[in-house]
Amino acid sequence: ELLSPGGSMKDRAVLSILRGAMSRGALAPGGHVLDATAGGLGISLAALCAAMGLRCTLVMPDSVSPLWKKRLEAYGAKIVLTPAAQGSAGCQEALARLRREDPAAFVPDIFSNDDAPQAHREGTGPELLRQVGNIDYLVAGVGSGSSLTGCAESIRMQCPDCRIIAVEPFASPVLSGGFPGSHPLAGIGPGFIPDNLNLYILDEVIRVKTPDSLALMRELAEKDGLLCGPSSGAALAAAILVAQRPEAEGKTVVTLLPDSGERYLD
């Protein structure tokens, strides 16, 4: 997905969310989009708002790198910084204040907005089926839960026996019943179970260790020429574990590499 205009799979979800909001009248032409994010979601929001003639304001901690801030501003986004010591609570407080100041502004909420998985039900899942054919295993990381849910629901319609496997960090095994923890695998393991994740479609959860994920991320670049992010390394680590199982011999294992690694070089 690094070939998406914003460099990540989040482009699909953001485009679907913005189009859905505009079609329902929740977001007017030339309207204002607000969100709190210091990750790849911000790039997708900034880029797509620019392309759709929308104003974009993003809240993030002041610990964000100057280059990251410049990237977002290059798309015309307005950046509101909060003290890093206040953590996510400080960002959410600032976001709430901005919403009070502009009640007509639209907040995407990628973790619970059903337009996000719909992008993958209608797009990514059918694309995989066209390109791959029968799929025996779908292995994907869980951030907002949108890509795994949407792809899985779409693929299961054509491949009812496909096993759906979620990937999460070993250090934050919330889907496995553990406790949230800090980790460097940006894009997965948010520390909670998102509303957009369809738990009922999951057959299994695989926990991946940080060193294994980062090693495969580097291997993708050095041996395959694919400069992907850490969540891609995590997904690939889990997919390899699945492919090595005796029962997977001769089967088709599909995984998703969500974003470009360039943004993590700062």
Locations of regions flagged by a protein language model:
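PLP-dependent amino-acid enzyme catalytic core
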Residues: 1-266
